Amino acid sequence: MTARWSGDWARPRVDGTAPAVDVLVPTVGRSAELATTLAGLAAQVDVDLRLVLSDQSADGDAASRPAVAAMLRVLEAQGRPVTLLTHHERLGLAEHRHFLLDHASAPTVLFLDDDVWLEPGSVRRMLDALRTLDCGFVGSAVQGLSYLADRRPHETAVFEPWSDGVEPEVVRRGTPAHDRWSLHNAANLAHVASDLGVEHGGWVPYRVAWVGACVLYDRERLESVGGFRFWPELPPEHAGEDVVAQWRVMERFGGAGIVPSGAVHLESPTTVTDRRVDAPDVVFR
């Protein structure tokens, strides 16, 4: 259901419609960042959503941290279903995403990293875009706002809107499409948005190499290309698992980013410290 306002928080909960979006959040050892992420999620008051949180922290107790627990209570008071999972065995990022996807039931799934704050209205814009474009996924690439004064025209020159609908395409390392990765550095999308002058509340779809940290998929289409079932091909220490899934979806159904992006990267140190194995190099070799 859409969020109940504070005047209704103490009223008995009433089962509403099935959520339009399952928000899938993997987390490990990041209580402050996770609380900020959940605060941004609670601000998405205009969309039916359910939270599925999977904790791989050593104690499996992220939900008990005061700030995290407070934000979970807000979501529940708003009438949002919350599912808390622990997943102690560390078999890698792809396996953890596979585990989360197995617990999803909504027609769309938002994979949201635990270090991303969302501007109010972000999920609604993504959902509107996914439905309008009828493609496999729509992403809101994260922006580091410490870079707002750092304009990088050499990195944004590859920006290319989808003007006549989203089409399937093949992206691989070494193709021209792969060069789009630079769009998502620093605060590049904020600069692109300001140059475009998008109408308030609107969005413009554009071509991507891939989108990290905040991606809304059509669940059926993601699962039809295998989802993250490729995880056994990878060692536990890897990166780029989301790239594999997105490239497969793009080949069949197309995918897009949208600008403006309301996703803000918290710029905390990464928890993925060993990136020697890049999943696309293994899966697409």
Model-derived segments and spans:
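N-proximal low-complexity "stem/linker" segments adjacent to membrane-targeting elements
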Residues: M1-A43
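C-terminal catalytic/acceptor-binding lobe
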Residues: T2-G7, G16, T36, W203-E220, ...
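A recurrent flexible, glycine/aromatic-enriched loop bordering the glycosyltransferase active site
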Residues: A94, V170-H191, G197-Y217
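Conserved donor NDP-sugar-binding/catalytic core segment of glycosyltransferases
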Residues: G121-S182
